[in-house]
Amino acid sequence: MAKNILIVDDAAFMRMMIKDILTKNGYNVVGEAENGAKAIEKYGELKPDLVLMDITMPEVDGIAALKKIKGSDPNALIIMCSAMGQQAM
């Protein structure tokens, strides 16, 4: 059975690229969010098997969203990714 994945990134182009790669490899993208606030909301609604989340986003950043999601579901699987490079967090 295909794994259900939630993609979170403020860049629509990145969401589209990630979704394309995942679906071509047999994964089911159940939702997308453009910021951390929407990610928290969508996680609660969809309960995906995995979340792929950007770090730097408007409204609520990925780190804050990660903490909120893990606070409500300690078993949540979340991969954080970013194009930040070597900047200090």
What are these regions (language model features)?
Residues 57:
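Receiver (REC) domain active-site loop signature in two-component systems and cognate sites
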Residues 35-38, 61-64:
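Acidic catalytic/metal-coordinating carboxylates
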Residues 46-52:
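Active-site beta3 strand of CheY-like receiver
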Residues 8-9, 33, 51:
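Conserved sequence signature across two-component system core domains
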Residues 12-31:
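Two-component/phosphorelay signaling modules centered on CheY-like receiver
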Residues 44-46, 69-76:
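Conserved phosphotransfer cores of two-component systems
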Residues 84-87:
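Short, conserved "switch-loop" micro-motifs in signal-transduction and mechanochemical regulators
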